[in-house]
Amino acid sequence: MHDAATSMPPQAPSTWADYLAGYRWRGQGEGCSAATVHRLEAARRPTLFVKQEVLSAHAELPAEIARLRWLHGAGIDCPQVLNETQSDGRQWLLMSAVPGDTLSALAPERLVRLVAAALRRLHDLDPAACPFDHRLERRLDTVRQRVEAGLVDEADFDDDHRGRSATELYRLLLDRRPAVEDLVVAHGDACLPNLLAEGRRFSGFIDCGRLGVADRHQDLALAARDIEAELGAAWAEAFLVEYGGDIDGERLAYFRLLDEFF
């Protein structure tokens, strides 16, 4: 549920006051990250978004800012960073809105084709040109840090893992780690709400803070999981067929397990 629209909150960066005068702020709630998101609207002016997060060792917003800038420069549709600053002990990001809406209005066949095509285009980028390393060596170290810091929400585990501890699942991650990685530029959190469409056309990726060089199964696992939950297993399989290539079922399961820690 979204909050009621308000004027610019007093804790927002004062340097934005003139530029954002007249905008109404509407809270979008919080997703899986600790960031808070507001949608900004004003008559005859472009819709904007503000994202903010408490500054900490585990904050993800600085990483998202860097990745949005790189991704926009690589020609992939995503929010454009308009300004970023630190104020009131928080990191603040002002960005453009990606046109369109979530994929929920699309017919199943169109949805799976759109998601497959969008991910193929992203994965076709040259990973050697991407400065963000999300290979398993680094990701597993991040998982270890999150487990040790008590940041993993065990109550939010999927049904397959409910009742197990984060430490237990971390050991399982280490035991089942794939021997090789099929590296691409991956979104890192390719669940359906993070892909938008305008009409029948893909319009952009959002929530790009985990983008980086990683195994393509990272994205395929989360997209297929969401498609199965929304449309059924047959459509998840159709998505993987539409994406093409040699898909490894064990690696899909592995990256779904990895996602439990974020």
Language-model segments: residues:
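Phosphate/pyrophosphate-binding loops and the adjoining catalytic core of nucleotide-dependent enzymes
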Residues: 2-3, 68
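An alpha-helical support segment within catalytic cores of ATP-dependent transferases
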Residues: 8-18, 121-188, 247-250
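Conserved N-terminal boundary motif of the eukaryotic protein kinase catalytic domain
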Residues: 19-28
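ATP-binding pocket architecture of kinase catalytic cores
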Residues: 28-135, 146, 180
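Active-site acidic catalytic loop and adjacent metal/ATP-binding pocket
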Residues: 33-44, 48-49, 81, 168-218
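Active-site Asp-x-Gly
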Residues: 58, 180-185, 198-253
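A cross-family signal for key residues in well-ordered alpha-helices
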Residues: 69-72, 224, 256
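Short hydrophobic/aromatic patches at helix-to-coil boundaries
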Residues: 259-262
